[in-house]
Curated annotation (Swiss-Prot):
It comes from Oceanobacillus iheyensis (strain DSM 14371 / CIP 107618 / JCM 11309 / KCTC 3954 / HTE831). This is Small ribosomal subunit protein uS10. One of its GO terms (biological process) is translation. InterPro entries: Ribosomal_uS10, Ribosomal_uS10_CS, Ribosomal_uS10_dom, Ribosomal_uS10_dom_sf. It comes from the Bacteria. It holds the Pfam family Ribosomal_S10. SUPFAM superfamilies: Ribosomal protein S10 (SSF54999). Belongs to the universal ribosomal protein uS10 family.
């Protein structure tokens, strides 16, 4: 495959699981003979939700919750068919969202 690259975007709420998954992908790609760029940390998305503490009144008493979405980007340059096959067989945790673009 000439002049091709595979771009992998990983998303997760837990950054430790995300980094472990990224290392697995990089290690698998390097073992199969492809050049790897990354993992590149992308900006963390932070969603803040404000909820009233009381059920009926007391609007001044509120509670805030936040959800952080961590993201990583991995580019696999010059992938071989062996690389693609190895990535398809890779077993990653269920808490990691993977987006692959060829």
């Amino acid at each position: 495959m000439a002049k091709e690259k595979i771009r992998i975007r990983l998303k997760a709420y837990d950054h430790r699981i995300l980094d472990q998954s990224a290392e697995k992908i990089v290690d698998t790609a390097k073992r199969s003979g492809a050049k790897v760029s990354g993992p590149i940390p992308l900006p963390t998305e932070k969603s803040v939700y404000t909820v009233l503490r009381a059920v009926h009144k007391y609007k001044d008493s509120r509670e805030q919750f936040e959800m952080r979405t961590h993201k990583r980007l991995i580019d696999i340059l010059e992938p071989t068919p062996k690389t693609v096959d190895a990535l398809m067989r890779l077993d990653l945790p269920s808490g990691v969202d993977i987006e692959i673009k060829l």
